[in-house]
Curated annotation (Swiss-Prot):
Subcellular location: Cytoplasm
PANTHER family: 3-METHYL-2-OXOBUTANOATE HYDROXYMETHYLTRANSFERASE
HAMAP family, per the entry: PanB (MF_00156)
GO biological process: pantothenate biosynthetic process
Pathway in which this enzyme or protein is active: Cofactor biosynthesis; (R)-pantothenate biosynthesis; (R)-pantoate from 3-methyl-2-oxobutanoate: step 1/2
Cofactor: Mg(2+)
Protein name, per record: 3-methyl-2-oxobutanoate hydroxymethyltransferase
Length: 271
């Protein structure tokens, strides 16, 4: 099977090439230079500076308190450590409320070292995605359980069951048509995530979306079995227990994603 040479930095076009080659993508969150460097040299393909930092770094109950300034600070720290992995950064809550606001926030993140920005949802966000892509800013879409919508969802719940699965399929195609180069699917039943992954021309990255996605992402604290003070999701696996060290855990996670052993049924959601 074709693989991306370890010495070659990942680029946006290389993501689509990996999908065509059947090469699973390995993604982790990071928020500082030390962890980012460890992830970069131990087989992680994409680093996400997620607004999850509000929960695991700042101690909030949700991601809603995170600001663009927070995202820029952590993105810059992570960017200084990377030689190989592609750096994706979240647009924080309401930073993408309008195309103009999104452009301002995305510009700051790219200037800090991000190579792609992540936007939650579809609907009116399609206009935002098109606006950014037309201005040469690569976009990753985030569908399914979108944490910035936690108040509307009434908590962190599986999305895309029943008729909602068909809407999720439509949304996934719509964000790709709008220009997204990558799609994160969170807390989505395995069958619908697998179907979406087969239908899209761009890679999907699953988190609680089963093994049929084109890659996987976990919050680093979850992958390392750290207690962040929040309920442990079903899809989380502690790789530090088998890896023996942070670097060993990262290598074990990366290998499990690439060989398809993670996630298994225990760490996914049925239809």
């Amino acid at each position: 099977m074709s693989s991306h040479a370890d010495s070659n930095p990942w680029t946006v076009p290389a993501l689509a090439q990996a999908k065509r080659a059947g090469r699973k993508l390995v993604m982790l969150t990071a928020y500082d230079a030390s962890f980012a460097r460890t992830f970069d040299v131990n087989g992680v393909d994409l680093i996400l500076v997620g607004d999850s930092l509000g929960m695991v770094m700042q101690g909030h109950d949700s991601t809603l308190a995170v600001t663009t300034a927070d995202m820029v600070y952590h993105t810059a720290a992570v960017a200084r450590a990377l030689d190989r992995a592609l750096l994706v950064a979240d647009l924080s809550f309401q930073a993408d409320a309008t195309p103009e606001r999104a452009l301002d926030a995305a510009t700051q993140l790219l200037q800090a070292g991000a190579e792609m920005v992540k936007i939650e949802g579809a609907g009116h966000k399609l206009e935002v995605i098109r606006y950014l892509v037309e201005r040469e800013i690569p976009v990753c879409s985030h569908l399914g359980l979108t944490p910035q919508s936690v108040l509307r969802f009434g908590g962190y719940k599986v999305q895309g069951r029943g008729e909602a699965g068909e809407q999720l399929r439509r949304d996934a195609q719509a964000v790709v048509d709008a220009g997204a180069s990558l799609v994160v699917l969170e807390c989505v039943p395995t069958p619908i995530a697998t179907q979406i992954s087969a239908e899209l021309s761009v890679p999907t990255i699953g988190i609680g979306a089963g093994p049929g996605c084109d890659g996987q992402v976990l919050v680093m604290h979850d992958m390392l079995g750290l207690d962040s003070g929040h309920r442990r999701p079903k899809f989380v696996k502690d790789f530090l227990a088998e890896g023996g060290s942070v670097a060993g855990a990262v290598r074990a996670y990366a290998q499990a994603v690439r060989d398809g052993s993670f996630p298994d049924a225990e760490h996914a959601y049925a239809a």
